[in-house]
Amino acid sequence: MAKHLIDTDLYIDLIQSGTTLSLIRELYDKDAPGIYFSSIVAQELLAGARTALGKRRVEALFRPFERVGRIVTPSHRHWKDAGAILAKILQQRPDLKSKLPALVNDCLLAVSTRSMGATLYTRNRDDFALLQRVRSFSLVVVG
């Protein structure tokens, strides 16, 4: 069975404007048992939820995955792999040093995606393409 992870940006679009509703609905309808939710995405969404209503909307997204045990959380090995990838990027592109802290969560998400043999869906072409130059993983960049 194919496995899928959805990046934070697509869920933000879903919550704020509904622009990704058709994409997410199609994926859920086609392959619901193969969809997983990353604890990284949960953290990023909760960090952006400034109201009680926003928090409830975010929790409504990941609670079903908690109930069925399909939450993906980076392991110690994933953190080490992410560190090695970020070091390699810095070695190849010293001009990106100030960008590295912003890449940590994306790198952890990429490493998690790769380790479980999943496909990651995102709109963030630039950051994930940069990570793919160092470590391959399955990626679908949406519109």
Q: Where is each model-derived feature located?
A:
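Active-site neighborhoods of divalent-metal-dependent phosphate/nucleic-acid chemistry enzymes
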Residues: R70-T119, R123
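A general structural signal for well-ordered alpha-helical segments in protein cores
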Residues: S38, A42, K55-V58, W79-A82, ...
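Short, hinge-like loop/turn segments at secondary-structure boundaries
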Residues: A52-R56, I89-L90, S138-V141
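Acidic, PIN/NYN-like endoribonuclease modules and their adjacent C-terminal/linker elements
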Residues: M1-K3, A110-G143
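Short, well-structured N-terminal submotif of metal-dependent ribonuclease cores
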Residues: M1-F37, A47-R63
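Histidine- and aromatic-rich ligand-binding microenvironments
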Residues: I6-D7, S38, P101-L103, N124-R125, ...
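Alpha-helix capping/helix-boundary segments
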Residues: L10-Y11, V41, H78, L108-L109, ...
